[in-house]
Amino acid sequence: MQDKYTPAEVERAAHSHWTARDAYRVTEDAGKKKFYACSMLPYPSGKLHMGHVRNYTINDMLTRYLRMNGHNVLMPMGWDAFGLPAENAALKNGVPPAQWTYDNIAYMKKQMQAMGLAIDWSREVATCDPDYYKWNQWLFLKMLEKGIAYRKTQVVNWDPVDQTVLANEQVIDGRGWRTGALVEKREIPGYYLKITDYAQELLDHVQVGNPNATLTGWPDKVRLMQENWIGKSEGVRFAFTHDIRGEDGQPIGDGRMYVFTTRADTIMGVTFCAVAPEHPLAAHAARSNPDVAAFIQECKTGGTTEAELATQEKKGVRTGLTVTHPLTDEPIEVWVGNYVLMGYGDGAVMGVPAHDERDFAFALKYGIEIKQVVLVDGETFDYHRWQDWYGDKQNGVTINSDNFSGLSYQEAVSAVAHALQEKGLGEKKTTWRLRDWGVSRQRYWGTPIPIIHCDEHGAVPVPEKDLPVVLPQDCIPDGSGNPLHKHEGFHAGVKCPVCGKAARRETDTMDTFVDSSWYFMRYCDPKNADAMVAGGADYWMPMDQYIGGIEHAILHLLYARFWTKVMRDLGLVKVDEPFTKLLTQGMVLNHIYSRRTDKGGKEYFWPHDVEHIQDEAGKITGARLKNAVGDLPAGTPIDYEGVGTMSKSKNNGVDPQELIEKYGADTARLYTMFTAPPEATLEWNDAAVEGSYRFLRRVWNFGVKLAGIDAAATEAAIQGAQSLQDVQFGKEAKALRLEIHTVLKQVDYDYQRMQYNTVVSGAMKMLNALEDFKSADAPGGLVALIEGFGILLRVLYPATPHIAHGLWSGLGYAGSLGDLLDAPWPQVDAGALMQDEIELVLQINGKLRGAIRVPSGADKAEIERIALASEDFHKHAAGAAPKKVVVVPGRLVNVVV
């Protein structure tokens, strides 16, 4: 064993050993308790970042710990390989997306292997592989057969830069989630999946407080995010009537404009209605009203989601049309509002300014009447200022509402619903915020939708025998839209499955969230050419622990749940939910430094080029360049923006490869685990990285020290540490074993809780105790030392497997106890936790005066005798005779004098 800790050599030797043993390949084993632990598969962007390192190390620690405890653990890995970045890189570099993607996969896989992750690479999948996406297409056809997939034309979010449709969840503040371009609204035909058919089940299983919820192993924050996104609302759907006729002379919408409300108790306070820009009444008004036409055109930019509309300025325009109030017969003005979504409900809303904050602001802006119809006792209504109680439905009572006055919220809703139903104009109804999932994308690098377009028979499904529809690998996007339109090879020889005439393929591809909605099931049986999933999924699913960022709380996690339920209903899997437990690891943060350029833009600087300016209290007040950067000399003042998520754009990322090359993979792993609990954010600290490296060097140096002991004595000590039956431990050895096993008990508990930062701190306590032990020659001393270091290596092994393997093998543990790959988790020795003596607090008249040591089994009389004979008692009692002695077992003695 080498004297100096050289991470590159230690890690190279460990990798060679693990590869030779094919250490991490797993198979189904009915004789073992299974555990499926999986990190969200990465997009092959080119290089790992520190967030990847943290995520995968969390997974690896869990995997190795459970294997040491006898579990059959699956830890697979794959690549979310389709998507727009590959097309954009191809456009920039002039190479096909396939080449760019597979080159990145090769490099990132090499990085993962350098990290020493216990991944079963025999189960690797790439979603751009035809053998994988064939099953996307196959299940899509099954969904078509069952009516779960369907085609329709709808207003969608159009990203003008990427030339594609975006799902509602992919629009942020009115802009595309990837490009930042202002999103437009367009009517485009596409394929949709009926996720709404599963809305109630999706809600029931995730809802916080629901006794039928099954996802209790998920963070409440994620569960609430999904619950709010699904958005179940109980209310009343009713119609305002009208006689507005279209160009055909018929009443538009059969003379009814429907709305949905959860506040039917305020129906008597309606003073206007607003319709979406795409509503038939808006289109009718636009034909004769230029202001309406111009407003509708303006509304075609921006998002189509509730989230986007909630943040943008609320605007509207009068249509000049009126509808009739269903209960009062009063005429109600119709407006076009940019905040009304055609895809939600009926594309129209009632306006009650007095009791809805959005309507209140809208009414003040445009001079619309405000009519109070709810009163909370003791409050005064102000027509010029919104107050939160205006919307209070729990404590309010209806007023100014004719026959409905004096009613509570529930009473009024029921009464109004009954009245509307009596008139045939409305009824109680449940609505959902969730909308069907549009999966068509006007891009090349994705799963081809298996549809053939025939002039005679329209859209015809591709026969199953012709799957997969293979994506051409030679396309290089030129920025002018979907290259599949122009790729004649993609359409060559295609015939209609119905009539046999020449036809063309569908050129839309599937949303890449389709790929990630079931990959975790394919891991269970990745090479099966005959079935999407088979017996492997029955053994491994549901996944026991899923690990990934909270940014996937709605998109990926909701779609994966839906996809699993569809597969269940098709008889493909037996589980209702894919993920039993979810851990959302915290972001990795770093300092951000910038300055304004002469042109008004921002220039960001790498942290290693910057030094802080601090006040007397040590608070950072500014920053300056430590080194010259470009034309800027050292000492140039720059702005300190605080800490934020690591990103390339802000030059505050840390390259894991550089970290591994300088300190080794074990240091990178240890640092990301020690600095913060897995679910908390991690603020990068170079000094703490150095500290992690120094700790591992201390571990290695202690191993070298043990290696210097006589080999025969060491081997005998290892054998002794294995059985302990014939070992007589002296006082010093017992004290060491007490400390080691006390820490081990806590560490084991922390491993079970996945609190890996305290696992590492426990390992540090163990090393301190071992280094402080100076009685190797005392009775049982060497055995206690060897046992303790063997425990430390096994505690560290899940976090830092390379150095643990090197020391375990180099010191001879493997010869007696077997390969560390197969070593069981160390068990806490109850005997080691038993103390010959314990320390009790000594009090005199209730005041702390010292401490005494007593035999651990001492009775009350013996404890009293020792207390009264102690030096501390005689010193503080000053000759006073004891009147009473109170003993609290295991804690203290109080002498009353």
From Swiss-Prot:
CDD domains registered for this protein in UniProt: Anticodon_Ia_Leu_BEm (cd07958), LeuRS_core (cd00812)
Pfam families assigned: Anticodon_1, tRNA-synt_1, tRNA-synt_1_2, tRNA-synt_1g
Residues spanning the signal sequence: none
Cross-referenced PROSITE patterns: AA_TRNA_LIGASE_I
Broad class of the protein's primary localization: cytoplasm
The reaction(s) this protein catalyses: tRNA(Leu) + L-leucine + ATP = L-leucyl-tRNA(Leu) + AMP + diphosphate
Keyword set, alphabetical order: Aminoacyl-tRNA synthetase, ATP-binding, Cytoplasm, Ligase, Nucleotide-binding, Protein biosynthesis
Subcellular location as annotated: Cytoplasm
EC number: 6.1.1.4
GO MF, one example: ATP binding
Short sequence motif 'KMSKS' region: positions: 645-649
HAMAP family, sorted: Leu_tRNA_synth_B
Record's protein name: Leucine--tRNA ligase
Gene: leuS
